[in-house]
């Protein structure tokens, strides 16, 4: 297979300075509850429902003995979050007031002052909503209802007209795949406001185009008698890669502090690691991770978030995946540490060598369709998106 990658060069306009933009985080006075109960409990944002339940002493430690099994009810339950916030009168005078959700995990319905403003369906996307006509100075009520990812994944699988190879139905939803259990992780399919919510006030941007990378790193793929080469050079000299695989540093992502990122990455640097591969079953990492890799001169091989399964390529799924890619390429592509974008984790390998066709009893017709959908996602859509948002693309 030709590995789908993109060397980091910036072609898009990066929001390098926001002279007239002001930010108001919506992080205080949050509450949450089970939709089947009446009592509200205090919540931490960013956070997850599991960590909020732990903080309120409503569940035992999920990592102790067999508590993982005992706590599976959490992922089949719907959860509500709410807060009230104020804004200044000066804020209300601005022509543009956007409410930005940097990470909602995963299926969520959002209401502001009783108005339905968003239905989120992708953990990896950023959602920006114009709320100029809804916001008021006092007592703004923000309410979010999270739906069961397990139940939605199962319902989507049940109506699919073909079997998509996977050990469960995680491949039907855009959520961190390790949340459904992996060889290193328990099955704790959480939900919640896992990244910041904020108001962006104002709309005057200063942009800088065609920023050049500060690291002169290139991928070399030269045909030879047995295939083609695959190595990196820096300033024209081959690099001996001492790499490692990076998976999320905590099952509950908001618990990963900047200090924890720093400790782990400094340890990797001291061990001689010069490249980390951000694994496709996890997340597009936090800004702190990439900032630290930039400063430590640790290269990053960046997977897109697909791993060990075949994924649906219907129209709605393709559009969702496209927007996910755009959001994350725009957010990350200015980091010199990212030397490679990779389409997925092990799917081509699995299709050709893991016996999926026999294991999942696929007909020849189904196999042809699945491979065509694979190509749509990873060789057509990803190629088009990366080509438009980067200066150079190898695939």
Q: Predicted segment positions?
A:
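N-terminal carbohydrate-binding accessory modules
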Residues: 28, 206, 210-268
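Aromatic- and glycine-enriched glycan-recognition loops and surfaces
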Residues: 73-79, 91-95, 127, 131, ...
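Loop/turn elements at helix/coil->beta-strand transitions in domains of secreted/extracellular proteins
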Residues: 139, 237-239, 269-276, 294-301, ...
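The substrate-binding groove and active-site-proximal loops of carbohydrate-active enzymes
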Residues: 118, 123, 183-186, 245-257, ...
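Bacterial Sec-dependent N-terminal signal peptides
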Residues: 1-22
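Accessory beta-strand-rich segments of carbohydrate-active enzymes
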Residues: 26, 33-35, 76-204, 275, ...
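Aromatic-lined substrate-binding rim segments of carbohydrate-active enzymes
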Residues: 266, 275-321, 327, 383-387
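Active-site neighborhood of glycoside hydrolase catalytic domains
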Residues: 295, 311-395
């Amino acid at each position: 297979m030709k590995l789908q990658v993109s060397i980091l060069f910036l072609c898009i306009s990066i929001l390098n300075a926001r002279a007239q933009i002001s930010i108001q985080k919506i992080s205080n006075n949050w509450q949450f509850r089970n939709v089947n109960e009446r009592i509200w409990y205090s919540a931490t944002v960013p956070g997850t429902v599991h960590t909020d339940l732990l903080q309120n002493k409503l569940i035992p430690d999920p990592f102790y003995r067999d508590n993982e099994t005992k706590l599976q009810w959490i992922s089949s339950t719907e959860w509500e979050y709410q807060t009230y916030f104020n804004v200044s009168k000066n804020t209300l005078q601005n022509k543009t007031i956007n409410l930005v959700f940097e990470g909602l995990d995963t299926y969520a319905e959002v209401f502001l002052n009783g108005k339905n403003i968003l239905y989120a369906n992708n953990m990896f996307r950023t959602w920006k909503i114009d709320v100029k006509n809804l916001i008021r100075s006092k007592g703004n009520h923000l309410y979010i209802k999270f739906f069961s990812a397990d139940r939605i994944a199962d319902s989507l699988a049940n109506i699919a007209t073909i079997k998509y190879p996977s050990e469960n139905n995680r491949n039907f939803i855009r959520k961190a795949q390790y949340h459904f259990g992996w060889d290193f992780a328990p099955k704790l399919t959480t939900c919640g406001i896992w990244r910041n919510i904020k108001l962006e006030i104002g709309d005057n941007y200063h942009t800088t185009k065609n920023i050049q990378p500060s690291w002169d790193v290139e991928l070399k793929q030269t045909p030879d008698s047995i295939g083609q080469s695959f190595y990196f050079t820096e300033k024209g000299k081959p690099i001996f890669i001492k790499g490692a695989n990076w998976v999320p540093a905590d099952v509950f992502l908001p618990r990963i502090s900047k200090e924890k990122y720093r400790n782990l990455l400094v340890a990797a640097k001291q061990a001689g690691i010069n490249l980390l591969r951000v694994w496709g079953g996890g997340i597009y990492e936090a800004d702190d991770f990439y900032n630290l890799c930039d400063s430590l001169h640790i290269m990053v091989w960046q997977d897109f978030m697909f791993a060990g399964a075949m994924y649906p390529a219907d129209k709605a799924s393709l559009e969702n995946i496209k927007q996910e890619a755009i959001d994350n390429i725009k957010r990350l592509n200015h980091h010199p540490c990212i030397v490679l974008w990779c389409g997925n984790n092990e799917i081509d390998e699995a299709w050709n060598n893991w016996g999926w066709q026999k294991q999942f009893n696929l007909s020849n017709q189904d196999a042809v369709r699945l491979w065509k959908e694979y190509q749509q996602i990873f060789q057509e859509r990803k190629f088009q998106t990366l080509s438009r948002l980067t200066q150079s693309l190898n695939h």
